[in-house]
From Swiss-Prot:
It is found in: Cytoplasmic vesicle, Secretory vesicle, Synaptic vesicle membrane; Cell membrane. Residues 2-94 are cytoplasmic. The chain crosses the membrane at residues 95-114. The gene is VAMP2. This is Vesicle-associated membrane protein 2. It comes from Bos taurus.
Amino acid sequence: MSATAATAPPAAPAGEGGPPAPPPNLTSNRRLQQTQAQVDEVVDIMRVNVDKVLERDQKLSELDDRADALQAGASQFETSAAKLKRKYWWKNLKMMIILGVICAIILIIIIVYFSS
């Protein structure tokens, strides 16, 4: 036997023309790596989703605070508007009473002047 014949790789089995099939352990490792990559991708997506939910919650909280402040301001405005309306109603009533008294005095003067 020659030295080159002893170190040559074994020939492929008869009937198979392609490369030898990978060992089952290598295939399961590849599947495990693919599955792990998918899991990592899902974890990254879920982290982004959780961050978005937390950001949305913060924005909703700020919006709720602003709505409460706006409601308080609206209530205060309504109270102030009612007081102002009442104030000007009384002022208008006083003006009408004064105008009525002046008209009555003028009418009395005219009646007294022309009746004599």
